[in-house]
Structure formats: C-alpha cells, structure tokens
Amino acid sequence: MTSSKKSSDNSSSSNDLYAIAETSGQQFWFEVDRYYDIDRLNAKEKDKITIDKILLIKDKENVSIGKPYIKNAKIELEVVSHKRDKKIIVYKMRPKKKTRRKMGHRQELTRVMVKSISISKSTPKSSPKTEATKKSTSSKASKPEN
C-alpha cells in the first residue's frame, strides 16, 4: 500500500511567500494570514504592528537574505488577543535535606495575525554622508570669525 499524500506538508504550496523575522529575542517563520503567539507586546487589540528586523524573505521566484537584516523590508501584524500560556511547574529539591520548593510560571503572550510581508525596492537619491559634509562646509563659510 502506497500513500498518495504529497510530501512537504510543512510548507504551504498555495502561498509561497514567507519571511523569517526576529521579535521578542526569538526568530519566527511568518506566513501571511496565519496566527502566531509571541511574547507580550505593549499594544491593544486590533492595533497594527510593524516588524523591521527581517532576516530572510522568500517569494515565488527569489530569496532575499539580510546581513543581518534586510533593508526596506517589513511585516505588518495585527494584534488579535492577549492571553497566558499554560503553567510550567518548577520543582527544586535538595536530597537528604527537608528543603523543597515548588513554583509555577505562566508566560504572558500576544496572539498576532500576519497581514502582509513586503520589501520595497527603493534606491537612495544621494548618500547622507555627502549631504552632511556639504551642510557643514557651507555653515562654516557663512559664519564670520571674530
């Protein structure tokens, strides 16, 4: 008996656009119209959030890799809800002593939905270093010395 199920069930074949981004000190694989639970953000429900620290973007024909981040790339997220993760129990015990300590922790999370992944192909008009040197030389020439 052979299985007719296609391999690579992890990657979505209908949507070839994805990005790997860094937020909350972790890296996430983001795809459009999917929900993700990340560490608690200071935002209200239905707020829009933009992530600029994008490490990789792949669309249908090409892959962009940042060094370390991709310039002019962004991911737009919408806050869906705030929630708490399941409780983690931490139990510490010292053998042969009557010392035991049981603690619990629940991580605060924010559920977000990815609205769009985009990269803009903009070229700089002029480098900021040359503009800064022009301004500094012109301001020195216009001031009279005492």
From Swiss-Prot:
Disulfide connectivity? none
Q: Give the InterPro entries listed for this entry.
A: bL21-like, bL21-like_sf, Ribosomal_bL21, Ribosomal_bL21_CS
* One record GO biological process: translation
Record GO cellular component, one term: cytoplasm
Residue ranges annotated as coiled coil are: none
Mind listing the GO molecular function terms for this protein? rRNA binding; structural constituent of ribosome
Region: Disordered; residue ranges are 95-146
Q: Per its UniProt record, what PROSITE patterns does this chain match?
A: RIBOSOMAL_L21 (PS01169)
One Pfam family recorded for the sequence: Ribosomal_L21p
Q: Which residues form the signal peptide?
A: none
Domain of life, per the record?
Answer: Bacteria
Q: Where are the transmembrane segments?
A: none
Q: Name the residue ranges with Basic residues bias.
A: 95-104
UniProt keywords, alphabetically: Ribonucleoprotein, Ribosomal protein, RNA-binding, rRNA-binding
Reported function: This protein binds to 23S rRNA in the presence of protein L20.
Question: Assembly and partners?
Answer: Part of the 50S ribosomal subunit. Contacts protein L20.
HAMAP family reported for this sequence: Ribosomal_bL21
Q: Which family does it belong to?
A: Belongs to the bacterial ribosomal protein bL21 family.
Q: What is this protein called?
A: Large ribosomal subunit protein bL21
Name its species: Prochlorococcus marinus (strain MIT 9515)
